[in-house]
């Protein structure tokens, strides 16, 4: 496991994302859960983002902590997410986590898939 707490992090998450994760963890009453962000093949642009809660941190996973919650990324996904930021939005179009990814050359209209 690689844990970063300094300023130069390969991926970060916003206060809004951390606050939402914390609220969801409080609902679940399971402090062992972490937000896992991953990239899989698919979507209309070639790759898509995935978000899930996970209790495990595997060997090689990258973790970053904010507001007492952890974000976890596997090494393969981290290659596509370098320099990115996980955020959370809630509005008329619904609520969702999303990734601001500087590596994405194209994204789909909903922002859930991308290409590099």
Curated annotation (Swiss-Prot):
Cofactor(s) the protein needs: iron-sulfur cluster
Disulfide bonds: none
A biological-process GO annotation: iron-sulfur cluster assembly
InterPro entries in UniProt: FeS_biogenesis, FeS_cluster_insertion, FeS_cluster_insertion_CS, FeS_cluster_insertion_RrpA, HesB-like_dom_sf
Keywords: Iron, Iron-sulfur, Metal-binding
Cofactor note: Binds 1 iron-sulfur cluster per subunit.
UniProt keyword Kinase present: no
Top-rank taxon, per record: Bacteria
Assembly and interaction partners: Homodimer.
Family: Belongs to the HesB/IscA family.
Protein name as it appears in the record: Iron-sulfur cluster insertion protein ErpA
